[in-house]
Design a protein with these regions (language model features):
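Structured, acidic catalytic/metal-binding patches in enzyme active sites
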Residues: 59-60, 67-78, 102
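Acidic (Asp/Glu)-rich catalytic clusters
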Residues: 26-31, 47-65, 81-96, 133-138
Length: 164
């Protein structure tokens, strides 16, 4: 599905927060909250959000599925199955967009269990761009990408963090 002509009815703006059920009361009382993120991989396979997010829906802010497992920066193409998780979440939550990290989380079929920084090279940038484009082509809403805190630098980086 290509969504380049879609115009969301509500763009999230302002300050957002990552949703956790144990902070539902705090979130509900936050003044001026612009949006909430929900970890996409934790969204159950249900048809509506009412059955599992009633407290968040009561806050009445846009809910953004936030992925942590696409591995956009990985050398392997992004899995269609993982993209379908984001698609399903966007549909269930009536989300104006979805987001994911600029990171890699697997290589050679091995999940590392952590968001790892992408080497800042020409080659890695080309792979990242292809993976973002491929992912966006199958999503029903725009994809926002978020950088991660790099805890280390790759020895052969060709760009600074800001340039990349």
């Amino acid at each position: 599905m290509n969504n380049k002509n879609l115009t969301p009815t509500v763009w999230p703006s302002g300050i957002g927060i990552g949703w956790r059920p144990d902070i539902a009361g705090v979130v509900a009382a936050l003044p001026g909250l612009g949006f909430c993120e929900v970890i996409a991989e934790s969204v159950p396979a249900v048809e509506t959000a009412e059955s599992w997010l009633p407290d968040l829906l009561a806050v009445d802010v846009p809910i953004i599925p936030h992925g942590v497992g696409l591995s956009l920066g990985g050398a392997e193409p992004v899995s269609a199955e993982r993209i379908s998780v984001l698609t399903r979440c966007a549909q269930i939550l009536d989300a104006p967009l979805v987001s994911e990290h600029i990171a890699f989380v697997r290589a050679g079929g091995v999940e590392v269990g952590h968001l790892l920084p992408v080497p800042r090279s020409h080659e890695a940038l080309a792979v990242l761009s292809d993976n973002i484009r491929r992912t966006q082509d199958f999503l029903p809403v725009p994809l926002a990408v978020e950088n991660i805190a790099s805890l280390f630098e790759w020895p052969d980086d060709e760009y600074s963090d800001g340039e990349f």
